[in-house]
Amino acid sequence: MTKKEERDAKLPPKSNFSEWYHELLRSAEIVDVRYPVKGMSVWYPFGFALRSHVYQIIKELLDVDHYETQFPLLIPETEFMKEAEHIKGFEDEVYWVTHGGRDPLDIKLALRPTSETAIYPMLKLWIRSHADLPLRIYQIVNTFRYETKHTRPLIRLREITSFKEAHTAHATWEEAAMQVEIAIQRYIEFYRRLAIPCLVSKRPSWDKFPGADYSIALDVIMPDGRTLQVGTAHLLGTNFAKTYEITYEDEHGEQRYVNQTCYGISERCIAALIAVHGDDKGLVLPWRVAPVQVVIVPIIFGEREPIIEVCRSIASTLAGRNIRVRLDDGDERPGAKFYKWEMRGVPVRIEIGPRDIKNGVVTIVRRDGVRKTLPMDERLVDAILIEAEELQTVLYNRAKEFMDSKIKLVSSLDEARSQVQSGVARVPWCGSVECGHALEDQIGANLLGEPRGDELPPMRCLVCGRESTGSTYMARQY
């Protein structure tokens, strides 16, 4: 962004969420939406650095027992069309390659909307016996979906640039079901490290992943009360194994179908990070993922060079402890620098002026507004790391308090209709498909599914009146 663009950038208040979000993506240089294909954005270098630090967390969590791999982007139509239920869920969203140069292709090639139909023909070749199981792999790739709805950067795209999809194969259905639980727990931990609490629910049968036995999803409540699905895990059972003939020889020499799972996260996790923690000044980033963790701003009064030398020394010390630090020694006024780095969400700002040097201290300002004086000696780095941990705790607690404030157990359809205008309604539900569809129609919101592990005392389904301990989250969704 040019200096003129920076001066002209005026961030709307976060209460005007849609405008705030789109302007912040530009002003903080996360993604540029001006690419000349609708629904496809370009990562700015700063935004891509943020993305890299975020995805490093999920890689660390998966690398414990998964192997990273990469499969081709193009999927032959003959493989893609094999799984009828799966294809029914994606057929209107597929981009097709029909020509190579000027020559029509004998077999059309799909740009992957997701990779089951690319990966599973290979698993048939890789898996031979029970000794090959469990198999756990993942890839981080781009996927393409012809979205006809209103596109939103990082939220609803035609090119998903950062799709992390894991695929596993197991000997039994029970082992696959356990893998789904492990996946959900790792996703919860992933978002905890981003200081983001999530709703976890089992999706209704009509909203499960095409071809799955069942689906579990994570949702984040956005500032306007809508929910954003930010992760899913699916138990596929033997459905795809039967289609692609993925079998193994068991201990008794018998051929059996594998049981499979798949689970994924996209750059929606970046959208959630921005939306949940950001404020009227811009991004607010947790320490772990901030491209710049500490910015040092010299406060120049009198002679410049002695102050700059002290700042350089502190920057060198911080960098020596693997802290991502930036010394902003440009000609702008301190206030302009504060504005710029607050917009980019830097967790800790250090201010150093002549008085600080004289007193042997530095002034630090955390991105949540906490201001402290710390000693300018060997204790400084550890003191800053403590502040980083405190900021993480503050961000999570603040986000959890907001999420809890947006969820309400309702006892009537009118109350539910009112609640979903600005939050999530927890609605008594008997669990039937008929009543589920009726709830969606009468409340005017999406049925997210049954909350995990939190039964209600007996209440009556708001549609049929039958007594039930079941319930569902309902919300307007992105």
Swiss-Prot record:
Q: What is its main location?
A: cytoplasm
Q: Which domain of life is it from?
A: Archaea
Enzyme class, one word?
ligase
Starting at the broadest rank, the lineage of the source organism is: Archaea, Methanobacteriati, Methanobacteriota, Stenosarchaea group, Methanomicrobia
Q: What does its UniProt record remark on the domains?
A: Consists of three domains: the N-terminal catalytic domain, the anticodon-binding domain and the C-terminal extension.
Family per record: Belongs to the class-II aminoacyl-tRNA synthetase family. ProS type 3 subfamily.
Q: How does it assemble?
A: Homodimer.
Q: Which UniProt keywords apply?
A: Aminoacyl-tRNA synthetase, ATP-binding, Cytoplasm, Ligase, Nucleotide-binding, Protein biosynthesis
Gene Ontology CC annotations of this record = aminoacyl-tRNA synthetase multienzyme complex; cytoplasm
UniProt cross-references to NCBIfam families, sorted A to Z: proS_fam_I (TIGR00408)
Supply the name of the protein. Answer: Proline--tRNA ligase
For this protein, the Enzyme Commission number is 6.1.1.15
Query: Where is this gene product found?
Result: Cytoplasm
